[in-house]
Amino acid sequence: MLRIIMRSIFLLAIVLTVATSLCFAQAAPEEGGNEIQIWAGGGHSVAGGRGDTGAFNAGLRYGWILTDPHLPSILRGRFEYALDAVPVFLIFQPANTSYGVGFDPLGLKWNFVRRGRLSPYIELTGGVVFTNHEVPAFTNTVNFMDQAAFGTHILGEKYNWSLEVRYMHISNAGLANLNPGVNTVQVRLGIGKFFIRH
């Protein structure tokens, strides 16, 4: 399984390298632009679900900046729609460590206007994760994820870093008789860029 995870990470690195070589960099999100990012994050369970559970995941994001700036003052920003492919998803629970893959087809992101080198954002995402063991134990191997995050892009000349705090709820949504769910708070780090295709 470790070999599969390492191959997945290597493949993500190749895809990001090729994709970014086809793009032109820009300093911050702009209407008509796109975002590509490779990211990794992890955290631990919090109250509201099964405890003593940790999570680590890594993936690739592609986003579309859909609007010019809207709203007044500190709320001013642009709307982005994003997709995440998550080829590395580990859940460390008392019974075992589950390995899986996930996909987040619903990423709703609000990129606040740039403040110096910082471009803060908030986002809501939803998706599905498939694991080799039941998560939590005695439930199901297919689960849904809903997430909320607050973070910032640290803008660079060529690439941007992102740092965020993310709340993730994992639940089978009633696919199994038991549905206790797992709630985690995670820290996620990413590297990517905003670009416009010409």
Region locations from a protein language model:
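Residues on the lipid-exposed face of transmembrane beta-strands in outer-membrane beta-barrel proteins
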Residues: 38-42, 58-64, 105-110, 124-128, ...
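Cleavable N-terminal export/targeting peptides
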Residues: 1-30, 196-198
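Transmembrane beta-strands of outer-membrane beta-barrel proteins
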Residues: 34-40, 77-85, 120-126, 161-165, ...
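Residues that define the transmembrane beta-barrel architecture of outer-membrane proteins
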Residues: 32-34, 52-58, 97-104, 118, ...
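Short loop/turn motifs that connect adjacent beta-strands in outer-membrane beta-barrel proteins
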Residues: 25-33, 67-79, 113-119, 155-161, ...
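Sequence/structural signature of outer-membrane beta-barrel proteins
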Residues: 43-49, 69, 86-94, 128-135, ...
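Short glycine/proline- and aromatic-enriched beta-strand/turn motifs that initiate or cap beta-hairpins
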Residues: 24-67, 179, 184-198
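Gram-negative (and chloroplast) outer-membrane scaffold detector with strong preference
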Residues: 58-131
